[in-house]
Amino acid sequence: EKGQDAKIGAVIMNANPFTLGHRYLVEQAAAAVDLLHVFVVSEDASLVPFSVRRQLVAEGCADLSNVVCHETGPYMISNATFPSYFLKDSDTVIRSHAKLDIQVFLRIAKALSVTDRFVGEEPFSQVTGIYNQVMAEELASTGLNCHIIPRKADEDGAISASEVRCLIRDGNFEALKKKVPACTFRY
């Protein structure tokens, strides 16, 4: 049980698949708070099935003692609350869906006494970039701190799950090994 002044953080990730970039985000967030809730998107609309993604995140964060992994269920970043994430709609629709999803998150955050929300910088996905912008705006009025963490980069630039999926598809396991934790590479 954490004290009343504890900093409690939250990260929501699809982790399709779990990369060194995801691990970096969790490390940065965990270092900044007393307790970090990591939510893995439950929607099974990804290359890597949810059960595997959740296992990879849990295994990839097992050494971080202040991290607790959860599934989002049908409540956060789901087809019910944020269909634009899966459909890639217009900016206006994305913004309204993001606001709805963030309102759901705020209810869960209140129940878990979350004080800080962490997201990775998003240079690649328009939908996620808009979501992060709306989230920063919405959280500013609630007293929740919003932290946008710069992406982990390697010699090829920012590490992205999209790039990792391409490496998997192309069978480029040498490059893949440099971008994912051992648990993901074994998968």
What does each model-identified segment do?
Residues 1-187:
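Nucleotidyltransferase catalytic core that binds NTPs
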